[in-house]
């Protein structure tokens, strides 16, 4: 990573700004202002962008792919725009390389905010299924007369179908 960033500086692609090493990624055709890509923090530490660029270097050496496709949370669009433009500007990939970002929506909690996966603040699938089954089981018991076993069986089938439908009926880019 250090060699990659040092080469960007030597080639005049990256420069120091407020102690950090950055690459300007703005293009004349941009309709909005894009901040530079930070490739090294002022304390010398690497960032996600730096790791992503190093990964692209490695993939170019090993595979020389025709297309790079990154699927991630849609909130990462700016990050990947910065990484892709830096990779092209630094000559890590050819200027016409096909680099695509596909953003998907987030799974949100009851508060409407995305789950915090790093801090473990997510609902486990088994708990979600259990909660759905419980709601459906209660509805069945309210409105139908059948054995507990039959009601439990139906709630599991309907619950799983509802979960699948809810997941697949939304556009991937929606939260």
PLM region spans:
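Alpha-helical recognition segments enriched in aromatics with Gly/Pro capping
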Residues: 1-175
